[in-house]
Structure formats: C-alpha cells, structure tokens
Amino acid sequence: MESAAALHFSRPASLLLLLLSLCALVSAQFIVVGPTDPILATVGENTTLRCHLSPEKNAEDMEVRWFRSQFSPAVFVYKGGRERTEEQMEEYRGRTTFVSKDISRGSVALVIHNITAQENGTYRCYFQEGRSYDEAILHLVVAELLEAEVY
C-alpha cells in the first residue's frame, strides 16, 4: 500500500505545464516597485516620483516611462539610452528632470517642477526590456496652500 498519493500527468499535459512554467519565469524577470504611500506635493513646488527594479538590475538599456493612465501620452520617456522629449506630453516639456544616477542599479526618479493642481492623481512608472515589462502605480496628492488673511 502506498503512503503518499502521486500525481500522474499525460505527456502532453506535462509538456504544457512545463511551457507555462517557463513562460511565467520569462515574463517575471523583474518587478517595478514604487512607494506604497501617496506622494504629497504642494502647488508651485517640485515633487519627485521614484521607482526601482526588484531584483536590482541595470536599466540603462531599458525603456523607462511615466504616464498618467494606460494608453495615455507620456509624462516622460527614456528609451535607447536617452530622453525622448518628442514622446512627452506638451504640458510636461521643460518641467521634468530624469534622475538616472542609479539607473545601473535599476533605480530612477522623475522630478516634476512647478506642480499644478491638475497633476493630482495616479502615475505609472513603467520599465520594459524586450518582452518583459512591469509597472508600479504611484499616487500623487497635490495640495494648495491657502494664505490666511490678516485683518
């Protein structure tokens, strides 16, 4: 009498299971990590959106992109080892700085200068290398400072 139950798969089922496992390994070469808490910003100030790869990996040859929602124009694009301002939304041109000093370790940031109230909301930090890609969702909360009137 056998003490442990054994699973037996047909040859085609075993091959399919192996292929699915390999596909999962290929597509999960890295994940993108961003802050879990909302990023707080004030109108007129600068704010920094940070994200990084896990495990740590050189991203110099990857595409890195920030955008507001899926399929929307980009807030910022880094591709082919350089910034691609021609793909950037007009309202962000000249107002962003790509911080890439740690890109060889998979860590990047985007500084948005002179934040406006309309920039409140969700941002996505997206990395792609070949067919592998992932994104982190960041939440930006923009507040306006109100000046108290003195009588």
Positions of PLM-derived features:
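Short structured motifs
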Residues: 33-36, 80, 108-110
